[in-house]
Amino acid sequence: VVPKERKLQLNAKPYYQLIEIKGTAFERGKRYGSSASGAIKRNIDFYSFAFEKSANIDWPQAQKLAMKFLPVIEKYCPSYVEEMKGIAEGAERSFEDILTLNCRSEVLFAKADACSCIIIPEGRGKNGHVFIGQTWDWMASARQNSVVLKVHQEGEPSILMICEAGMVGG
């Protein structure tokens, strides 16, 4: 029996909240976190349940596992760390909560996702621009906690993506 507080609307029809963010990585994250705080909480509840059911670990154990990935993320993508810190502050959650959401695949599975990627090379797309896309082949029940995120990064291409609330990317 699933406790009342753990029951998720698995058949809920998703709608996607559009969140547009700009500024430094931390500023983008803070705006994103405050705009999606309810969905982030639901996403944490969702993965807490998923970790228990699929990996037989509780949320604090998942956080400890996720922390093992932090040095690599800091080394290769420090802006993601800053964005996650901003999300945590904006959503009034711990950094560990947001990091754990972003390491959910690594915590749940030791295999690659089944997502597909596509690229339209320079000169072949509209206005000659490069376009990159990826499918989202994940648990359908996670859609209810997803948002459409429009990211404006200084000196970098803008990004429009569907992502689970609290996730960074780009």
Task: Briefly describe each language-model feature range.
Residues V1-G170:
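N-terminal mature-domain region immediately after signal-peptide cleavage
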